Amino acid sequence: MARIAGVDIPRDKRVVISLTYIYGIGKPTAQILKEAGVSEDTRVRDLTEEELGRIREIVGRLKVEGDLRREVSLNIKRLMEIGCYRGLRHRRGLPVRGQNTKNNARTRKGPRRTVANKKK
């Protein structure tokens, strides 16, 4: 397996697909192969050291893996500290982007907590 940005990428897949195993690189960003002068159809095992070096250099300029994860978590912490609506939603563990919470949002809210009925 080739290592790029501290991640082992699969050898048997095409390079454009293998790059998406790196956090922060999706299919659009994987188009950096054109800049590196590498064909998208090439398998990782067929890459030369020179081509791998060019890809590593370009990926090194991007914010990926640990740096990107750290930036995202700091952004969320900042929202929570300033007390804006999105920060409050993060703090309470509710959906942040305006989704309905009356019936759904179980992934974000966690398992149901049943409430005892009042006696009449």
From Swiss-Prot:
InterPro entries referenced in this protein's UniProt entry, alphabetically: Rbsml_uS13_C, Ribosomal_uS13, Ribosomal_uS13-like_H2TH, Ribosomal_uS13_bac-type, Ribosomal_uS13_CS
SUPFAM superfamilies in alphabetical order: S13-like H2TH domain (SSF46946)
Cysteine pairings via disulfide bonds: none
GO biological process: translation
Gene3D superfamilies: 1.10.8.50, 30s ribosomal protein s13, domain 2 (4.10.910.10)
Keywords for the protein's UniProt record, in alphabetical order: Ribonucleoprotein, Ribosomal protein, RNA-binding, rRNA-binding, tRNA-binding
Pfam families per UniProt: Ribosomal_S13
Region described as Disordered: 93-120
Any one GO molecular-function label of the UniProt entry: tRNA binding
UniProt keyword tRNA-binding present: yes
Record bears the keyword DNA repair: no
GO cellular component terms attached to this protein's record: cytosol; small ribosomal subunit
Biased composition (Basic residues): 105-120
Stored NCBIfam families: uS13_bact (TIGR03631)
Protein function: Located at the top of the head of the 30S subunit, it contacts several helices of the 16S rRNA. In the 70S ribosome it contacts the 23S rRNA (bridge B1a) and protein L5 of the 50S subunit (bridge B1b), connecting the 2 subunits; these bridges are implicated in subunit movement. Contacts the tRNA in the A and P-sites.
Family to which this protein belongs: Belongs to the universal ribosomal protein uS13 family.
Assembly behavior: Part of the 30S ribosomal subunit. Has been shown to cross-link to S19 forming a loose heterodimer. Forms two bridges to the 50S subunit in the 70S ribosome.
Name of protein: Small ribosomal subunit protein uS13
Organism ancestry: Bacteria, Bacillati, Bacillota, Bacilli, Bacillales
